[in-house]
Amino acid sequence: MYKQQYFISGKVQGVGFRFFTEQIANNMKLKGFVKNLNDGRVEIVAFFNTKEQMKKFEKLLNGNKYSNIKNIEKIVLDENYPFQFNDFKIYY
């Protein structure tokens, strides 16, 4: 399993980016979450079954037509990442 954390910056809050991300993740049957951060970025934690699934998701992170992605910071999470997820959700 591949566990990734992403910090997305740019015009990503107030434009439906979390909903867009949730739809993609649920269509791909991913587990994890997406949430707004106080500094204007969006955080995503996602668990992938295959590297191909991860690459496909990352290609779709360009956002919807209302967002404007400036930067994507990607962090590989340790296999011992302490949280488990049953689905993919928006955290508020």
From Swiss-Prot:
NCBIfam families: PRK14432.1. The keyword Hydrolase applies. It holds the Pfam family Acylphosphatase. Keywords: Hydrolase, Plasmid. The lineage of its organism: Bacteria, Pseudomonadati, Spirochaetota, Spirochaetia, Spirochaetales. Residues 3-92 form the Acylphosphatase-like domain. InterPro entries: Acylphosphatase, Acylphosphatase-like_dom, Acylphosphatase-like_dom_sf, Acylphosphatase_CS. Disulfide bonds: none annotated. The keyword Coiled coil does not apply. Belongs to the acylphosphatase family. The active site is at 18, 36. GO terms for molecular function: acylphosphatase activity. Its EC number is 3.6.1.7. This is Acylphosphatase. It catalyses: an acyl phosphate + H2O = a carboxylate + phosphate + H(+).
